[in-house]
């Protein structure tokens, strides 16, 4: 009965874990993140460590905490320990998506979706890199799936795990960690007949609650970094969204998002093309809501990506996962 789940776990681990330390850091982004964890361990400053004697981190600390904690166990910060959090995040997201769709469709389709997710180029690449994107994606996707489960159960109780996932996402890369999950579920709930003001207040409240833990770090970092920290936060968040950064960072046109989406899902983009000429698959009533959630998620994510003047390929990983589930 549990063989498909065991297969997903084993395949994910075998595809990722043995290979993380085989190559040196090969982009400027990887050592930039790893050195933050190294500075934390060397200086003992876990709030706002100074890197190379002059720089403060460009991103919130959750990803760096993960690297530092893993490196404490091995005794050093190296390529393997720096990439391990991304790999574990991808494994967790793959397993989580499998369990989610197995309960709402069947084991065969859930297994297919999990393997498509794990082997798509952009997702797999992020899972073996020392960058914040994979941990951010896992937290955002986790929040969406948990919010959906909460909605599915009649919106009863409090979705604590979903809120904690958003907190982790905010502590990984900033406000996008709560904006995207709440916006997606807000759109989905309205599509499913939810009342506008009630839905808006509900997800607005969840967004505020998800900021409690990140606020503790932001306040502590502000006390330590002062105006320089505030200027950096403004540029990395507001400046990045409005295209007013003092330097160009991954600035691309709107069509670039779709080009990245198609190449990032390689080699499975061919399946999407071939499916255009096949007969529509029958949908069961049990999966109608899940399909609607995927559609709302993909559309909302595309909107958020187009509004970001410096959208990264890593920001499209959530859409890759949801689009391949729709293809199934």
Show which residues each predicted segment covers.
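Membrane-integral, polyisoprenol-dependent glycosyltransferases
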Residues: 1-293, 299-328
